[in-house]
């Protein structure tokens, strides 16, 4: 392949990416909806679990953004369309959506409740 052909292939890929907004095809994710503040601090210590729903609702009411915590992937995604997620804040959900090219933001197309969150912090396991 000569340089001109290679350049045209790269240009075509860049244009195709720009046309779809740099998003990936729709994917399904399972995760917890929480506020960015609490979830990012927990993730920094290795915890990718649901957070206290009451606390998350208070933080979002105070201006924090809603995020999707992905426990299996050990990742947190920012949510582009916040209103879709607001009613299920603190819950475990299944989300169908597209992520940006960097895989850091998701646009939710559909959301399904899997399990309601409980207002409890991470507790140590009881010893027998």
Region roles according to the model:
Residues 18-128:
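OB-fold and OB-like single-stranded nucleic-acid-recognition modules
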Residues 1-5:
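Positively charged n-region of N-terminal signal peptides that target proteins for export
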Residues 7-10, 79:
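Generic anion/oxyanion-binding catalytic loop in active/binding sites
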Residues 10-19:
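Hydrophobic h-region of N-terminal signal peptides that target proteins for export
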């Amino acid at each position: 392949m000569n340089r001109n052909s290679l350049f045209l292939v790269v240009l075509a890929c860049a244009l195709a990416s720009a046309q779809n907004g740099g998003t990936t095809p729709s994917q399904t994710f399972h995760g917890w909806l929480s506020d960015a503040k609490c979830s990012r601090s927990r993730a920094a210590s290795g915890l990718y679990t649901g957070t206290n729903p009451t606390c998350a609702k208070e933080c979002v009411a105070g201006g924090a953004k809603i995020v999707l915590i992905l426990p299996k992937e050990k990742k947190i995604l920012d949510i582009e369309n916040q209103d879709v997620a607001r009613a299920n804040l603190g819950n475990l959900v299944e989300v169908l959506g597209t992520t940006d090219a960097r895989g850091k933001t998701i646009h939710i197309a559909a959301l399904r409740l899997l399990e309601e969150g409980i207002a409890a912090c991470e507790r140590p396991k009881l010893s027998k």
